[in-house]
């Protein structure tokens, strides 16, 4: 009877929107809808491609594993698949101009990887010609589906990892991607490494007697989007034992605030951490030119601003699945007396 099928839940420590259950003939991955947590976003039934399809499968999208020719929309997931040793399973990509990985650029030049165009409006003919075994893309709230690619009968893997609110929760999704690409042992050991490094760094920060207050980001247009207190970034500041000026805020995403509101709260912050995308690195004079109000911040006057130029630095490509790298940067910025963490990887002090 149904009752005697042995299952074993694969224990996940941090991810809140992912459940993995292994059965003898297949694995079920259930993705919780991050925008409506009582509902399921998607259920996948992972069946080894080498085995015949079992007769009685539960409801869900059947994916034959390991994937050997996937279309991967985002550079984050390309980078992860590469780190899992499954690079040859990437058959196509979208948004090539945002993908900094040299191996991907070379693959497209050589013709071993198809350039499927713009992720928002992919080249259907390219995708059809490729016959991929799955398409990995990031879902959006109320996206109203994925248009024509849904009719191709190719499994769509909804990469909702970015909606996890803890950095380790997001990184733990690599275990799902490991199962998809036949790299589960590698993914499990990589995640164990990330987890232990993160915990060790967190402990180092807790032992520090330095306690600096921190504000982040810049205004864009009329609004300044600051990370909510419960967002990934807000929680990272907390794990780095920095006093984040919006720590009390309850949002798990970014919140748009007026400049005055941020200034009232953060004008006296010890450290200011910014990310931007420009041809050349930003300086204090650039900040002043951009918006004179910035010069009123204590961190501007004391020259304690750190910037990450995402045009040159693989911040968005690496940090989702290596939050320990980002935590190490934040700890070195917020606890300058800790001098043996290998130097900054993403941020640097602004020049004049």
Model-derived regions: residue spans:
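Extracytoplasmic substrate-binding proteins
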Residues: 112, 123-125, 129-223, 247-248, ...
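Extended, charge-rich intrinsically disordered regulatory tails
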Residues: 287-299
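A ligand-binding cleft/hinge motif common to bilobed small-molecule-binding domains
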Residues: 141-151, 276-288
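Catalytic-loop region of hydrolases
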Residues: 7-39, 48-49
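Short, small-residue-biased leader/transition segments that mark boundaries at the very start
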Residues: 3-5
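A short, structured surface patch at a secondary-structure boundary
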Residues: 30, 35-128, 134-141
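Flexible, glycine-rich surface segments
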Residues: 196-197, 201-285
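Short, structured coil segments at secondary-structure junctions
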Residues: 86, 152-153, 240-241, 301
């Amino acid at each position: 009877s149904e009752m005697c099928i042995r299952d074993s839940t694969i224990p996940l420590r941090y991810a809140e929107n992912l459940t993995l259950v292994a059965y003898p003939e297949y694995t079920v991955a259930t993705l919780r809808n991050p925008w409506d947590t009582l509902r399921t976003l998607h259920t996948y039934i992972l069946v080894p491609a080498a085995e015949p399809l079992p007769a009685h499968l539960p409801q869900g999208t059947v994916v034959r594993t390991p994937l050997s020719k996937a279309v991967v929309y985002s550079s984050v997931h390309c980078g992860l698949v590469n780190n899992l040793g499954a690079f040859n399973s990437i058959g196509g990509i979208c948004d090539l101009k945002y993908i900094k990985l040299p191996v991907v650029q070379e693959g497209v030049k050589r013709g071993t990887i198809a350039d499927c165009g713009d992720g928002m409006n992919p080249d259907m003919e390219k995708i059809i010609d490729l016959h991929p075994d799955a398409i990995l893309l990031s879902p959006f709230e109320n996206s109203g589906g994925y248009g024509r690619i849904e009719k191709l009968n190719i499994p769509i893997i909804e990469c909702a990892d970015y909606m996890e609110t803890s950095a380790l929760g997001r990184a733990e999704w690599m275990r799902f991607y490991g199962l998809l690409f036949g790299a589960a042992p590698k993914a499990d050991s990589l995640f164990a490494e990330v987890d232990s490094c993160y915990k060790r760094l967190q402990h180092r920060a807790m032992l520090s007697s330095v306690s600096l207050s921190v504000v982040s980001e810049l205004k864009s247009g009329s609004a300044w989007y600051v990370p909510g207190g419960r967002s990934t970034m807000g929680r990272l500041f907390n794990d780095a034992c920095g006093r984040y000026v919006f720590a009390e805020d309850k949002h798990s995403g970014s919140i748009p605030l007026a400049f005055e509101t941020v200034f009232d709260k953060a004008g006296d912050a010890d450290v200011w951490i910014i990310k931007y995308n420009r041809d050349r690195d930003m300086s204090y004079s650039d900040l002043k030119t951009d918006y004179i109000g910035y010069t009123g911040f204590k961190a501007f006057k004391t020259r304690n601003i750190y910037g990450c130029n995402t045009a040159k630095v693989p911040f968005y490509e690496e940090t989702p699945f290596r939050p320990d790298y980002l935590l190490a940067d934040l700890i070195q910025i917020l606890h300058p007396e800790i001098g043996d963490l290998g130097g900054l990887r993403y941020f640097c002090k602004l020049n004049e």
